[in-house]
Protein backbone atom coordinates (compact mmCIF):
# COMPACT_ATOMS: atom_id res chain seq x y z
CA UNK A 1 0.00 0.00 0.00
CA UNK A 2 3.05 2.24 -0.45
CA UNK A 3 1.59 5.05 -2.55
CA UNK A 4 -1.94 4.96 -1.18
CA UNK A 5 -2.96 7.83 1.10
CA UNK A 6 -3.82 7.31 4.78
CA UNK A 7 -7.34 8.59 4.10
CA UNK A 8 -7.90 5.93 1.40
CA UNK A 9 -6.52 3.18 3.67
CA UNK A 10 -8.98 4.25 6.39
CA UNK A 11 -11.85 4.22 3.87
CA UNK A 12 -10.87 0.70 2.73
CA UNK A 13 -10.94 -0.54 6.36
CA UNK A 14 -14.38 1.04 6.89
CA UNK A 15 -15.73 -0.52 3.68
CA UNK A 16 -14.38 -3.96 4.64
CA UNK A 17 -16.13 -3.67 8.02
CA UNK A 18 -19.42 -2.63 6.41
CA UNK A 19 -19.20 -5.46 3.87
CA UNK A 20 -18.52 -7.93 6.71
CA UNK A 21 -21.62 -6.58 8.53
CA UNK A 22 -23.71 -7.09 5.39
CA UNK A 23 -22.45 -10.67 5.02
CA UNK A 24 -23.32 -11.36 8.67
CA UNK A 25 -26.95 -10.55 7.82
CA UNK A 26 -27.32 -12.03 4.34
CA UNK A 27 -26.09 -15.21 2.66
CA UNK A 28 -25.54 -15.02 -1.11
CA UNK A 29 -26.41 -18.70 -1.70
CA UNK A 30 -29.65 -18.32 0.27
CA UNK A 31 -30.57 -15.17 -1.69
CA UNK A 32 -30.05 -17.00 -5.00
CA UNK A 33 -32.05 -20.00 -3.75
CA UNK A 34 -34.91 -17.71 -2.69
CA UNK A 35 -34.69 -15.95 -6.06
CA UNK A 36 -35.16 -19.26 -7.89
CA UNK A 37 -38.17 -20.13 -5.71
CA UNK A 38 -39.89 -16.78 -6.38
CA UNK A 39 -39.19 -17.04 -10.13
CA UNK A 40 -40.70 -20.54 -10.10
CA UNK A 41 -43.83 -19.26 -8.29
CA UNK A 42 -44.27 -16.50 -10.86
CA UNK A 43 -44.19 -19.01 -13.74
CA UNK A 44 -47.31 -20.66 -12.28
CA UNK A 45 -50.27 -19.03 -14.15
CA UNK A 46 -52.60 -19.45 -11.12
CA UNK A 47 -50.56 -16.93 -9.08
CA UNK A 48 -51.93 -14.14 -11.32
CA UNK A 49 -55.49 -14.90 -10.15
CA UNK A 50 -54.62 -13.07 -6.94
CA UNK A 51 -53.34 -9.67 -8.08
CA UNK A 52 -52.18 -8.63 -4.59
CA UNK A 53 -50.15 -11.83 -4.16
CA UNK A 54 -48.70 -11.52 -7.67
CA UNK A 55 -47.65 -7.92 -6.96
CA UNK A 56 -45.96 -9.01 -3.71
CA UNK A 57 -44.00 -11.72 -5.53
CA UNK A 58 -43.01 -9.31 -8.32
CA UNK A 59 -41.71 -6.76 -5.79
CA UNK A 60 -39.86 -9.50 -3.90
CA UNK A 61 -38.30 -10.74 -7.15
CA UNK A 62 -37.09 -7.23 -8.00
CA UNK A 63 -35.57 -6.78 -4.52
CA UNK A 64 -33.83 -10.19 -4.54
CA UNK A 65 -32.46 -9.59 -8.05
CA UNK A 66 -31.04 -6.23 -6.96
CA UNK A 67 -29.41 -7.75 -3.87
CA UNK A 68 -27.98 -10.68 -5.85
CA UNK A 69 -26.52 -8.40 -8.54
CA UNK A 70 -25.14 -5.92 -5.99
CA UNK A 71 -23.51 -8.69 -3.92
CA UNK A 72 -21.74 -9.92 -7.08
CA UNK A 73 -20.70 -6.37 -7.98
CA UNK A 74 -19.28 -5.60 -4.52
CA UNK A 75 -17.43 -8.93 -4.38
CA UNK A 76 -15.89 -8.33 -7.80
CA UNK A 77 -14.89 -4.73 -6.86
CA UNK A 78 -13.13 -6.00 -3.72
CA UNK A 79 -11.25 -8.54 -5.90
CA UNK A 80 -10.22 -5.73 -8.30
CA UNK A 81 -9.16 -3.62 -5.32
CA UNK A 82 -6.93 -6.38 -3.96
CA UNK A 83 -5.09 -6.68 -7.30
CA UNK A 84 -4.80 -2.89 -7.69
CA UNK A 85 -3.36 -2.52 -4.15
CA UNK A 86 -0.69 -5.14 -4.86
CA UNK A 87 0.37 -3.33 -8.04
CA UNK A 88 0.18 0.18 -6.55
CA UNK A 89 3.52 -0.06 -4.71
CA UNK A 90 5.48 0.38 -7.94
CA UNK A 91 2.90 2.18 -10.07
CA UNK A 92 1.53 5.68 -9.34
CA UNK A 93 -1.15 5.22 -12.00
CA UNK A 94 -2.36 2.08 -10.24
CA UNK A 95 -2.52 4.00 -6.93
CA UNK A 96 -4.88 6.42 -8.70
CA UNK A 97 -6.91 3.41 -9.89
CA UNK A 98 -7.21 2.26 -6.24
CA UNK A 99 -8.82 5.62 -5.38
CA UNK A 100 -11.33 5.17 -8.23
CA UNK A 101 -12.26 1.62 -7.14
CA UNK A 102 -12.70 2.81 -3.53
CA UNK A 103 -15.02 5.59 -4.70
CA UNK A 104 -17.09 3.09 -6.69
CA UNK A 105 -17.12 0.66 -3.75
CA UNK A 106 -18.44 3.35 -1.39
CA UNK A 107 -21.53 3.80 -3.55
CA UNK A 108 -22.00 0.05 -4.12
CA UNK A 109 -21.65 -0.89 -0.43
CA UNK A 110 -24.03 1.88 0.64
CA UNK A 111 -26.64 0.70 -1.90
CA UNK A 112 -26.28 -2.88 -0.64
CA UNK A 113 -26.57 -1.79 3.01
CA UNK A 114 -29.79 0.09 2.30
CA UNK A 115 -31.26 -2.85 0.36
CA UNK A 116 -30.47 -5.40 3.06
CA UNK A 117 -30.60 -3.52 6.34
CA UNK A 118 -33.03 -0.67 5.61
CA UNK A 119 -35.70 -2.76 3.92
CA UNK A 120 -38.70 -2.01 6.15
CA UNK A 121 -41.87 -0.75 4.51
CA UNK A 122 -41.51 2.78 5.96
CA UNK A 123 -37.71 2.96 6.23
CA UNK A 124 -37.36 5.43 3.29
CA UNK A 125 -39.82 7.88 4.94
CA UNK A 126 -39.38 11.07 6.94
CA UNK A 127 -39.52 10.62 10.73
CA UNK A 128 -41.38 12.27 13.60
CA UNK A 129 -39.16 12.21 16.68
CA UNK A 130 -40.60 13.09 20.11
CA UNK A 131 -38.70 13.57 23.37
CA UNK A 132 -40.41 13.40 26.78
CA UNK A 133 -38.61 13.95 30.11
CA UNK A 134 -39.01 11.35 32.85
CA UNK A 135 -39.71 12.16 36.52
CA UNK A 136 -37.26 14.57 38.11
CA UNK A 137 -38.38 18.09 37.17
CA UNK A 138 -35.86 20.57 35.77
CA UNK A 139 -32.95 18.10 35.61
CA UNK A 140 -34.94 15.66 33.40
CA UNK A 141 -36.39 18.49 31.32
CA UNK A 142 -32.89 19.82 30.66
CA UNK A 143 -31.79 16.30 29.66
CA UNK A 144 -34.73 16.04 27.24
CA UNK A 145 -33.62 19.28 25.56
CA UNK A 146 -30.01 18.04 25.32
CA UNK A 147 -31.27 14.90 23.54
CA UNK A 148 -33.46 16.95 21.21
CA UNK A 149 -30.45 19.07 20.25
CA UNK A 150 -28.37 15.90 19.70
CA UNK A 151 -30.88 14.59 17.14
CA UNK A 152 -31.21 17.98 15.45
CA UNK A 153 -27.42 18.20 15.09
CA UNK A 154 -27.34 14.61 13.75
CA UNK A 155 -29.97 15.55 11.14
CA UNK A 156 -27.98 18.64 10.10
CA UNK A 157 -24.83 16.52 9.68
CA UNK A 158 -26.83 14.18 7.41
CA UNK A 159 -28.08 17.11 5.32
CA UNK A 160 -31.67 16.48 6.46
CA UNK A 161 -34.22 19.25 7.12
CA UNK A 162 -35.74 19.67 10.57
CA UNK A 163 -39.12 21.19 11.39
CA UNK A 164 -40.24 21.79 14.96
CA UNK A 165 -43.79 20.49 15.23
CA UNK A 166 -44.28 21.04 18.95
CA UNK A 167 -42.14 22.66 21.65
CA UNK A 168 -43.24 23.08 25.28
CA UNK A 169 -40.54 24.71 27.42
CA UNK A 170 -39.86 23.65 31.01
CA UNK A 171 -40.48 26.03 33.94
CA UNK A 172 -36.79 26.86 34.58
CA UNK A 173 -34.92 25.13 31.77
CA UNK A 174 -35.28 22.37 29.22
CA UNK A 175 -38.49 21.05 27.70
CA UNK A 176 -41.68 19.40 28.92
CA UNK A 177 -42.37 17.97 25.49
CA UNK A 178 -41.12 18.34 21.93
CA UNK A 179 -41.72 16.77 18.54
CA UNK A 180 -39.67 17.39 15.41
CA UNK A 181 -40.12 16.23 11.83
CA UNK A 182 -36.84 15.08 10.28
CA UNK A 183 -37.11 15.18 6.49
CA UNK A 184 -34.66 13.17 4.44
CA UNK A 185 -34.22 9.91 2.61
CA UNK A 186 -34.33 6.96 5.04
CA UNK A 187 -34.70 9.28 8.07
CA UNK A 188 -37.11 6.81 9.71
CA UNK A 189 -35.00 3.79 8.74
CA UNK A 190 -31.95 5.24 10.46
CA UNK A 191 -33.75 6.49 13.57
CA UNK A 192 -36.36 3.80 14.24
CA UNK A 193 -34.25 1.96 16.85
CA UNK A 194 -33.58 5.18 18.80
CA UNK A 195 -37.02 4.79 20.42
CA UNK A 196 -36.68 3.95 24.10
CA UNK A 197 -35.42 5.33 27.39
CA UNK A 198 -32.14 7.29 27.44
CA UNK A 199 -30.39 7.61 30.84
CA UNK A 200 -28.13 10.46 31.97
CA UNK A 201 -25.75 10.42 34.97
CA UNK A 202 -24.09 13.74 35.85
CA UNK A 203 -23.47 16.37 38.52
CA UNK A 204 -26.62 18.45 38.19
CA UNK A 205 -26.08 22.15 37.42
CA UNK A 206 -29.47 22.72 39.11
CA UNK A 207 -28.38 21.24 42.46
CA UNK A 208 -26.62 23.71 44.77
CA UNK A 209 -25.08 20.77 46.67
CA UNK A 210 -23.45 19.55 43.39
CA UNK A 211 -24.71 16.00 43.83
CA UNK A 212 -24.76 13.33 41.17
CA UNK A 213 -28.17 12.80 39.56
CA UNK A 214 -29.62 10.12 37.29
CA UNK A 215 -32.25 11.35 34.84
CA UNK A 216 -34.33 9.66 32.19
CA UNK A 217 -35.99 10.83 28.98
CA UNK A 218 -37.92 8.78 26.47
CA UNK A 219 -37.56 9.08 22.73
CA UNK A 220 -40.28 7.95 20.34
CA UNK A 221 -39.78 7.72 16.57
CA UNK A 222 -42.58 7.11 14.07
CA UNK A 223 -42.60 7.35 10.27
CA UNK A 224 -44.43 10.10 8.42
CA UNK A 225 -46.99 8.02 6.54
CA UNK A 226 -49.09 8.69 3.47
CA UNK A 227 -52.78 9.44 3.68
CA UNK A 228 -53.56 6.17 1.91
CA UNK A 229 -52.79 4.11 5.04
CA UNK A 230 -56.01 2.46 6.10
CA UNK A 231 -56.53 3.83 9.63
CA UNK A 232 -60.01 5.01 10.50
CA UNK A 233 -60.25 8.07 12.74
CA UNK A 234 -63.81 8.88 13.76
CA UNK A 235 -64.56 12.57 14.52
CA UNK A 236 -66.51 11.58 17.68
CA UNK A 237 -63.33 9.93 19.05
CA UNK A 238 -61.45 13.23 19.00
CA UNK A 239 -61.20 16.05 21.51
CA UNK A 240 -59.74 19.09 19.72
CA UNK A 241 -58.40 22.11 21.65
CA UNK A 242 -56.61 25.26 20.53
CA UNK A 243 -53.99 27.17 22.52
CA UNK A 244 -51.35 29.86 22.07
CA UNK A 245 -47.99 28.55 20.85
CA UNK A 246 -45.20 29.23 23.29
CA UNK A 247 -41.60 28.34 23.76
CA UNK A 248 -37.98 28.77 22.93
CA UNK A 249 -38.55 27.56 19.41
CA UNK A 250 -37.33 30.96 18.18
CA UNK A 251 -38.04 31.45 14.50
CA UNK A 252 -39.63 27.99 14.36
CA UNK A 253 -42.63 28.79 16.52
CA UNK A 254 -45.71 30.77 15.58
CA UNK A 255 -47.10 32.99 18.37
CA UNK A 256 -50.81 33.25 17.42
CA UNK A 257 -53.74 31.35 18.99
CA UNK A 258 -53.40 28.67 16.31
CA UNK A 259 -51.72 25.76 18.09
CA UNK A 260 -53.84 22.61 18.15
CA UNK A 261 -53.99 19.73 20.62
CA UNK A 262 -55.89 16.57 19.67
CA UNK A 263 -56.73 13.79 22.13
CA UNK A 264 -57.77 10.43 20.70
CA UNK A 265 -60.24 9.37 23.40
CA UNK A 266 -60.23 5.56 22.86
CA UNK A 267 -56.43 5.29 23.21
CA UNK A 268 -55.59 8.43 25.22
CA UNK A 269 -52.97 9.45 22.62
CA UNK A 270 -52.37 13.22 22.68
CA UNK A 271 -50.83 15.05 19.72
CA UNK A 272 -50.02 18.76 19.47
CA UNK A 273 -48.84 20.93 16.61
CA UNK A 274 -47.93 24.61 16.74
CA UNK A 275 -45.49 25.41 13.97
CA UNK A 276 -47.80 25.81 10.97
CA UNK A 277 -49.11 29.20 9.91
CA UNK A 278 -52.82 28.55 10.52
CA UNK A 279 -55.07 26.60 12.85
CA UNK A 280 -56.28 24.50 9.91
CA UNK A 281 -52.72 23.52 8.92
CA UNK A 282 -51.83 22.70 12.53
CA UNK A 283 -54.93 20.51 12.76
CA UNK A 284 -54.01 18.67 9.53
CA UNK A 285 -50.44 18.05 10.74
CA UNK A 286 -51.66 16.88 14.17
CA UNK A 287 -54.11 14.47 12.49
CA UNK A 288 -51.31 13.16 10.29
CA UNK A 289 -49.13 12.44 13.36
CA UNK A 290 -52.10 10.87 15.17
CA UNK A 291 -52.67 8.59 12.19
CA UNK A 292 -49.01 7.53 12.21
CA UNK A 293 -49.16 6.88 15.98
CA UNK A 294 -52.33 4.79 15.68
CA UNK A 295 -50.74 2.84 12.86
CA UNK A 296 -47.64 2.28 15.03
CA UNK A 297 -49.89 1.12 17.90
CA UNK A 298 -51.55 -1.38 15.57
CA UNK A 299 -48.16 -2.68 14.35
CA UNK A 300 -46.89 -2.87 17.96
CA UNK A 301 -49.98 -4.88 18.95
CA UNK A 302 -49.31 -7.37 16.13
CA UNK A 303 -45.62 -7.57 17.08
CA UNK A 304 -46.53 -8.23 20.73
CA UNK A 305 -48.95 -10.97 19.71
CA UNK A 306 -46.17 -12.65 17.72
CA UNK A 307 -43.74 -12.23 20.63
CA UNK A 308 -46.23 -13.70 23.09
CA UNK A 309 -46.72 -16.68 20.79
CA UNK A 310 -42.93 -17.05 20.69
CA UNK A 311 -42.77 -16.44 24.45
CA UNK A 312 -40.12 -13.74 24.39
CA UNK A 313 -41.82 -10.69 25.85
CA UNK A 314 -39.32 -8.88 28.08
CA UNK A 315 -39.70 -6.60 31.08
CA UNK A 316 -40.51 -3.38 29.26
CA UNK A 317 -39.18 -0.90 31.83
CA UNK A 318 -35.62 -2.28 31.84
CA UNK A 319 -35.67 -3.65 28.30
CA UNK A 320 -36.65 -0.20 27.09
CA UNK A 321 -33.60 1.52 28.61
CA UNK A 322 -31.46 1.55 25.52
CA UNK A 323 -28.50 3.83 26.22
CA UNK A 324 -26.64 5.44 29.12
CA UNK A 325 -24.82 8.77 28.91
CA UNK A 326 -22.42 9.11 31.85
CA UNK A 327 -20.79 12.50 32.44
CA UNK A 328 -19.54 11.79 35.99
CA UNK A 329 -17.44 10.26 37.63
CA UNK A 330 -16.07 9.32 34.16
CA UNK A 331 -17.31 9.96 30.62
CA UNK A 332 -18.95 7.15 28.68
CA UNK A 333 -21.90 6.67 26.34
CA UNK A 334 -22.91 3.02 26.12
CA UNK A 335 -25.64 1.30 24.13
CA UNK A 336 -27.09 -1.55 26.21
CA UNK A 337 -28.27 -3.53 23.19
CA UNK A 338 -25.21 -3.54 20.93
CA UNK A 339 -22.50 -2.93 23.55
CA UNK A 340 -21.09 -0.05 21.45
CA UNK A 341 -19.50 2.60 23.66
CA UNK A 342 -17.38 5.74 23.45
CA UNK A 343 -15.75 8.07 25.98
CA UNK A 344 -16.30 11.10 23.71
CA UNK A 345 -19.51 12.38 25.31
CA UNK A 346 -19.17 15.87 23.78
CA UNK A 347 -19.08 14.55 20.20
CA UNK A 348 -22.13 12.35 20.87
CA UNK A 349 -24.12 15.24 22.33
CA UNK A 350 -23.17 17.24 19.23
CA UNK A 351 -24.92 14.68 17.02
CA UNK A 352 -22.09 12.24 16.31
CA UNK A 353 -24.25 9.12 16.83
CA UNK A 354 -23.76 7.20 13.57
CA UNK A 355 -21.64 4.55 15.32
CA UNK A 356 -24.66 3.69 17.52
CA UNK A 357 -27.19 3.87 14.68
CA UNK A 358 -25.14 1.69 12.31
CA UNK A 359 -24.48 -0.92 15.02
CA UNK A 360 -28.16 -1.13 16.00
CA UNK A 361 -29.25 -1.49 12.36
CA UNK A 362 -26.91 -4.48 11.96
CA UNK A 363 -27.93 -5.86 15.39
CA UNK A 364 -31.66 -5.82 14.60
CA UNK A 365 -31.13 -7.04 11.02
CA UNK A 366 -29.22 -10.06 12.38
CA UNK A 367 -31.95 -10.77 14.92
CA UNK A 368 -34.66 -10.77 12.29
CA UNK A 369 -32.71 -12.68 9.64
From Swiss-Prot:
SMART domains: PCRF. The modification N5-methylglutamine is found at residue 251. InterPro entries: PCRF, Pep_chain_release_fac_I, Pep_chain_release_fac_I_sf, PrfB. GO terms for cellular component: cytoplasm. Belongs to the prokaryotic/mitochondrial release factor family. One of its GO terms (molecular function) is translation release factor activity, codon specific. This is Peptide chain release factor 2. The keyword RNA-binding does not apply. It is found in: Cytoplasm. It comes from the Bacteria. It comes from Thermotoga maritima (strain ATCC 43589 / DSM 3109 / JCM 10099 / NBRC 100826 / MSB8). PANTHER family: CLASS I PEPTIDE CHAIN RELEASE FACTOR, PEPTIDE CHAIN RELEASE FACTOR 2. NCBIfam families: prfB. Peptide chain release factor 2 directs the termination of translation in response to the peptide chain termination codons UGA and UAA. Gene3D superfamilies: 3.30.160.20, 3.30.70.1660, Release factor. Methylated by PrmC. Methylation increases the termination efficiency of RF2. Keywords: Cytoplasm, Methylation, Protein biosynthesis.
Amino acid sequence: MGMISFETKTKIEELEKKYKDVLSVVNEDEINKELEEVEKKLTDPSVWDDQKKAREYTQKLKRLKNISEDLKRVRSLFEDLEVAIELSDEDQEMAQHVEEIVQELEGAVKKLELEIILNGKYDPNNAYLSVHPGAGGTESQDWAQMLLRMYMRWAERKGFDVEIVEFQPGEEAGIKDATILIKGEYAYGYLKHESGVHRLVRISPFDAARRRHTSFASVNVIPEIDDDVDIEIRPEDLKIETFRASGHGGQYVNKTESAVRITHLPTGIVVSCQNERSQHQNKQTALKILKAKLYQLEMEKKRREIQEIQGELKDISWGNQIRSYIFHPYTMVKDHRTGVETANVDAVMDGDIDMFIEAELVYFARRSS
